[in-house]
Regions:
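Register position in tetratricopeptide repeats
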Residues: 50-51, 84-85, 118-119, 152, ...
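Canonical positions in the second alpha-helix
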Residues: 63-64, 97-98, 131-132, 165-166, ...
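Structural marker of alpha-solenoid helical repeat scaffolds
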Residues: 67, 101-102, 134-135, 166-169, ...
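Residue-level recognition of tetratricopeptide repeat
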Residues: 71, 105, 139, 172-173, ...
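TPR alpha-solenoid repeat register
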Residues: 74, 108, 142, 175-176, ...
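Canonical tetratricopeptide repeat
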Residues: 77, 111, 145-146, 178
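Terminal, low-structured helical/coil segments at or just beyond the last alpha-helical repeat
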Residues: 182-222
Length: 222
């Protein structure tokens, strides 16, 4: 992961982006350029993400990329913006660029899997997230995404095993949303809502990524 010489103040679970996953992954590291200008551009672009002004974010980030063409963080953020615009081909291009510069950069690696997930290519998404789990088996987000892939594929037996593997109590809302997804899939929305409500109470804004993932899947519990 690239060195982080200064802090960009963004919530750990901003995404989507995932966040449809993209912003969560994007916010886990800062660019190596420590200039005030670069920091200001990043913060302004993230504010555009919050306001759903993705074209504005892209304009800022593309200009910054022209000045910092080898920066995997900036390239990952550009990919995140294209993801939000559902331009998945462009998003893939920038995630690949990010990984060319930093092959182990978790945010970009995660977002590649998220592209498969958003396009309903659950077999490839599952393969990708499981490969990432080999390097980080206790990562709750990866556990959650792999579980959802199995659930969407109708493999309930394997999904149940994956759900049991999600840490409780954990550092993220993954366990709660995993339980909610399982309950919803089995027709018990009342129970599912209870899990989501509990997650909101405990984790606050850290639930944003998980809520967006449910929205992407058409799981409406709010």
């Amino acid at each position: 992961m690239p060195h982080n010489p200064f802090s960009v103040k963004t919530p750990t679970f901003l995404l989507s982006a995932f966040l449809a996953g993209a912003l969560l992954a994007a916010s886990q590291a800062a660019p190596p350029d420590n200039s005030r200008e670069a920091k200001a551009v990043i913060q302004a672009a993230l504010a555009d993400f919050d306001a759903k002004k993705y074209d504005d974010a892209l304009a800022k980030l593309r200009a910054l990329d022209a000045k910092m063409p080898d920066d995997p963080f900036v390239q990952n953020l550009i990919g995140a913006a294209y993801t939000k615009k559902k331009d998945y081909a462009a998003a893939q291009k920038y995630f690949d660029k990010s990984l060319e510069k930093s092959p182990d950069f978790f945010p970009a690696k995660f977002n590649v899997g998220e592209l498969f997930f958003l396009q309903r290519n659950y077999p490839e998404a599952l393969k990708h997230f499981r490969q990432m789990q080999q390097q980080d088996p206790q990562n709750e987000l990866l556990q959650f995404k792999a579980f959802l892939c199995l659930l969407q594929l109708g493999n309930k037996e394997e999904a149940a095993k994956a759900l049991k593997g999600i840490k409780y109590p954990g550092d993220t809302p993954a366990w709660y949303y995993g339980q909610a997804a399982w309950a919803s899939k089995n027709g018990d929305n009342k129970k599912a809502i209870g899990y989501v409500t509990g997650a909101h109470y405990i984790f606050g804004p850290k639930t944003a990524l998980f809520d967006e993932t449910f929205d992407d899947l058409g799981i409406n519990l709010r």
